[in-house]
Amino acid sequence: MIKYFKIVLLIVVGSWLTACHSKSKTKSTSGEKPKTETNVSSSKMKNVADLLGVKESEIKNEDLYKFIAAWYGTPYKYGGCDIKGTDCSCLTINLYQKVFKKNLPRTADEMMKMCDKLSSSKVEEGDMVFFKIESKQVTHVGVYLKNDKFIHASTKKGVMISDLNEPYFKKYFYTFGRLK
């Protein structure tokens, strides 16, 4: 009886794992270029500047803002790590790899442990913003931009720019951090 149960369990678990990992592959026939940091239109860059409340001419780190323009609107996907779907820590990992040529660990809490904490008067563009959302550990991370704005991956709206002065972010804000 136990042997029969183990065989049935193995078959059920095996088919469940196969079903969870199957992907349908479709190709775009629209002729559009895939979203990348290198083919960002100037109108998207202007939109990012507008969201930050700055003029395009005030954008100095062009690689950073090209990355933001390309990834803006990417859907949230827990465990996702590419432009088709990402979570907050992987957005930050990709941004740091592509813009700053730095490697980061996979979780927001591990990232925070690699940083020196900063006061709001010391924070600069590219520093990380950490949140403890109903937890004792850091559970959310974003990257500081300008004018109290930061980029992050929202579970509901995907990759977006938010304001640190919004009540939700004020409530859960933990600290700013700069890589040691």
Task: Locate the predicted segments by residue.
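Glycine- and charge-enriched low-complexity intrinsically disordered segments
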Residues: 167-180
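...with weaker cross-activation on analogous glycine-rich loops/strands in unrelated enzymes
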Residues: 56, 102-166
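Post-signal-peptide N-terminal segment of Sec-exported extracytoplasmic proteins
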Residues: 37-84
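C-terminal motif of bacterial Sec signal peptides marking the signal peptidase cleavage site
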Residues: 16-19
